[in-house]
Amino acid sequence: MSLTTAAPLLALLKEKDAEVKAYALQSINEGVDQFWSEVSNDLPEIEALYDDNGFQDRKMAALIASKVYYNLGEYESAVKYALAAEEKFDIDEKTQYVETIVSKSIEMYIKLATEIYNKSGEQVNLDPKLTIVFEKMMTKCTQANEYKLALGIALEAFRLDVVKSILQERLGEDQEGGSMKLMSYVLTAATTTVFNSKFKDEILRLLFDLLMPLKNADYFITSKVVVNLNDPELATQLFEKLHDEEQIEVSYQIAFDLVSSASQHLLEKLHHNLSERSYDSGLLEILTGIPTCDYYNTFLLNKKNIDISLLNKSKSSLDGKFSLFHTAVSVSNGYMHAGTTDNSFIKANLSWLGKAQNWAKFSATASLGVIHKGNLIDGKKVMAPYLPGSRSSSRFIKGGSLYGLGLIYAGFGRDIVDYLKTHLIENSGTTGDEDVDVLLHGASLGVGLAAMGTANNEVYEALKDVLYNDVATSGEAAAFGIGLTLLGTGDETAINDLFTYAQETSHGNITRGLSMALALINYGRQEQADELIDKMLASENSLIRYGGAFSIALAYVGTGNNKVVKKLLHLAVSDSNDDVRRAAVTALGFVLLRDYTTVPRIVQLLAESHNAHDRCGAAFALGIACAGKGLQAAIDVLEPMTKDPADFVRQAAMISLSLVMIQQTEKMNPKVASINSHFLSVITNKHQEGLAKFGACVALGIMNAGGRNVTIQLENAETGTLDTKSVVGLAMFTQFWYWFPMAHFLSLSFTPTTIVGVRGSDLNIPKFDMNCYAREDVFSYPKMFEESADKEVEKVATAILSTTARAKARAKKTKKEKDTNEDDKKKKEKDLKKEETKKDDAKKESEAEEDFNKNRYSSKPYKIENMSRVLPQQLKYVQFIKEERFTPVRKFKGTNGVVVLKDNKPSEPASIIETVRQSKDVNAPLPTPFKVTEELDFEKI
């Protein structure tokens, strides 16, 4: 007979006989889920039974106490008593109670393990019983083949030993199948969800140690590990193994991947290590970055689709006599021609160029560096007419040319660093002379770009000498140069020196430059930068707090760390300085790069703030996080902001809108045409403020950047890492707020939208086709700008006598009163008809658009040539043809960039695409293979 109350059983607990108590506990346990509310009244007695060490069934008492606390919702106490129950608590029991207790146990274990690992609480004690539950669950997961679940929990709990044992166990079972997938899973988890830098490094080194001894290792996963660790010695080991196994084409592909994703420090050190071992000259050349840049320059030049009429319209609408407008057109021209090596617009508009004054000349000259970005062979030759020592007399042209040189060689400056460094050393002793300061300004920015991330000590010392001269013009640029050179190094000595000097100097420009330098030095360092960030944010100097916001942005870039997001939001609404508030909101864009879809929701309220600087920051945050994504939610927030009352908010909104919309076609987003025309209307409108016009002109340049063949890609799809150069380019670009020439830094973020198939045997680009399974017109270029020819001729009013005018007015008034009623009726009818027509058209458009988006895929492919424009959204539709002569060395997974190809018919001649470098090569090219026929019939020739 079933019990309806627990009272009799609870009464038995008061008996003295231990066996009676044990029976009562056993019976209560069976019905505790039903009678827990009654049992809860006697909890103190049950707990007392557990506390009695002489009572044999005390573990059962603990189990009952746990179940009662579970039903009361007090999970911490429930876990405590469940652990005390030891073997009485059956971890395999399939009940909600057990699942909840196990889940809460693991949560508690992870929390305590995190505290211990971070040493945030040295007195923290980890209950061994909690560890037993955790390890039992790990065993249970592996027995059920739930390896990913076990690895994920182990990573969260900082249990590297568990991760290692699971991976080794799987490697022992099968060397190729599931184990490689698990390795890839751990790599992805480590790079996207593990926020502790030290533990992340430990995981990656473990993966490298496990992968390297394997006979059939996946070297592409290994290369991703190397890039994330940024360790040249590990990279050298990888290439040595590839060399020993004679996997030349695979090593070439990995080298190209490293060029597009690794730091300059890693590339230079790796090149040096392999040079000492007399490695394959082809591999060494790839590591210099010259072939990659040459391929991209060739693509951008051959496929350029520059809307020159748009640029001409901007130029004619903005008066070049004003420095602001001249700089806007220079920057826009630089963007539109970025990487194409085509400076025809400048040559065709020399009279306009001559209008430039002072710093506008500096910007115009530097824009040549943007146009020739990546031209590593002829870069210095192109800039030679403007460099110091040439016939040019203007100090602004000389300074601008040195900055331009840095923009050409950004990230690949091995051959130009010494030249730029010489200018710093020769002139640093004569600062204070305005001519010298302008030259040093350009040289400091140039050398910072060329030596980016190398931690070159000689460059650092030369820049420090310029900085300590305490001249605002050269000192600010020297600070930026130091930040770029020491990018991501976290050099403690440099950090202390720069922070101290930022507090001491009386020049605001230098303080702000040093604050940004500190942010750059702490790039990607996460919690290791916390101490400095707290010091900067606690400073009374708003310029240092400004740098603190950017330090958060760059130290935690792409992490999506909640703690950091909260800190930035608090700073955005509480700081007394507008610049700091704007920087804090902008920083959200960097932190949430990988979670970009959440940004419109987070900044929505800030975009409607009463504070114009918060609104401006919200616009920049959207532009940065959603760059190149075409995210509709971001566009919906930004579009109303282009009509904001504050001119600088409109400027930020237009620039950010162009960052989001870059490489969007009219079929992908119908708003492309209207946004472009809005930018143009702002430029041509005489009543718009100068800042808004500047923003519109720059935005047009971004929308049509690189001959309409580049995008902004902040994450490297192949390695899963952030593109450091792109992130730094955007961060430095935001400084145009204070100094317009900084706008050129955005060119660092431009990524060509192409697939370049390269033959592994000779690094030439063969002509062949790929399949694209999409509708052919989806990804076509937007229409070129055409100025309407049917402009109305303005009529000149004829003179009328005053008496005649009065008579006409009286007659008109009488007639008007008669016709008013009839006109009103007709007008209302017309308006109604118009509205109905508009609604019908809008409905048809939305239906057509919806239908189009659903049916973007086509079962019948069309052919695209090698080195064609392939948009990021198009990549998933592209496939290599299996029967084709050229096939990729690595399985193609829809990523752009350089793809090394295997030639399946190497003895047959192939058509080759000539690169920019090859077209200028004075040496005779190697002859193409040909067949010799022994017997020739000369009569038939």
UniProtKB/Swiss-Prot annotation:
Residues 816-854 have a biased composition (Basic and acidic residues). Acts as a regulatory subunit of the 26S proteasome which is involved in the ATP-dependent degradation of ubiquitinated proteins. SUPFAM superfamilies: ARM repeat. InterPro entries: 26S_Psome_Rpn2 (IPR016642), ARM-like (IPR011989), ARM-type_fold (IPR016024), Proteasome/cyclosome_rpt (IPR002015), PSMD1_RPN2_N (IPR048570), RPN2_C (IPR040623). This is 26S proteasome regulatory subunit RPN2. The gene is RPN2. The lineage of its organism: Eukaryota, Fungi, Dikarya, Ascomycota, Saccharomycotina. PC repeats lie at residues 363-396, 400-437, 442-476, 477-511, 513-546, 547-582, 583-615, 617-651, 652-689, 695-731. One of its GO terms (biological process) is proteasome-mediated ubiquitin-dependent protein catabolic process. Signal peptide: none annotated. GO terms for molecular function: endopeptidase activity; enzyme regulator activity; ubiquitin protein ligase binding. GO terms for cellular component: nucleus; proteasome regulatory particle, base subcomplex; proteasome storage granule. Residues 808-854 are annotated as: Disordered. Pfam families: HEAT_2, PC_rep, RPN2_C, RPN2_N. Keywords: Proteasome, Repeat. Belongs to the proteasome subunit S1 family.
